[in-house]
Amino acid sequence: MRNDTRKHFNNFAAQVAKLNGVPDATQKFAVDPTIQQRLEKRIQESSDFLSRINMVGVDELKGEKLALGVTGPIAARTNVANQDRKTRDLTTLDAQGYECRMTEFDTHLGYAKLDAWAKFPNFQAMVRDVIVRQQALDRMMIGFNGTSAATQTDPVANPYLQDVNIGWLQQYRTQSPARVMAGGKTNGKVLIDPTANANEPGIVGDYATLDALVYDVVHSLIAPWFRRLPGLVVILGRNLMSDKYFPLLNQLPPSEQLAADLVISQKRIGGLQGMDVPFFPDNALMVTTLDNLSVYWQNGARRRFVTENPKRNRVENYESSNDAYVVEDFGAGCLVENIELSEKAING
């Protein structure tokens, strides 16, 4: 590390300590609650997708869901001559609740990288933003791919962070399997084929188009009072996208494709807006309102310390947060997996 870089690093560590009211950021400390809220806001705002869902702080490690979305109709009329008026609970009655699990977001930056950044006047913001952005990406990856919360995670065996926490899709599989379609005429396969509607022997296709699939699951797997709710969207795997729905994606330069956090379809899919979100699994789609998906983080539970490791020629940032991924109301969404497009469906 060059001497001028060291000055920048020392100022960065001093600023982190000052903001959190601790004498030294190189010793483990609890992030100040106000700073934690500001950091979580930065993480959310760094992602177009996370900005559209709920990211809220909770006081308890586990408890009842906050029920942040609409949970059903309340309008009624009562003949008070015969009975009393009755109120309706606006919150979700869900015995599952939530449980926050400690998640480590440990990173490092090599001396060479820091030396290259030292010439920029916004050095501290650059260091902060690269950490914030990766935490946002990791939360999306866990939300769509997480299936367990292992005591010791294995990033080699689980490259999509499947063992870090239990994500939204896995909760549908385990807590609301009736709203999950994983097969059609053939077990383990939902086949899209233009001949699906033909009354001919040997036809194995389940739906003629993705539009037909989406329309059907909205009317068969989602609770009736949510089916026409404004804000229902279709999140689908990248391999199911086509120029019909996303004609502009392939026209973007590679750098913009990489930076695109959330791509919205120009045409509707089964009557709903389609969305391509990073790390959503291939061969799958999810219908939901975005405010039905949440990330809870525990207030006062974020821990951090920053240290230099000259043995590895780098600066290390150790950070942890207690997080939970929550589906507010399973009735407001559904999941379809194992979707296959036939050659006819792909080639039109």
Report residues per predicted region.
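Charged linear interaction tracts used for macromolecular binding and regulation
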Residues: 219-220
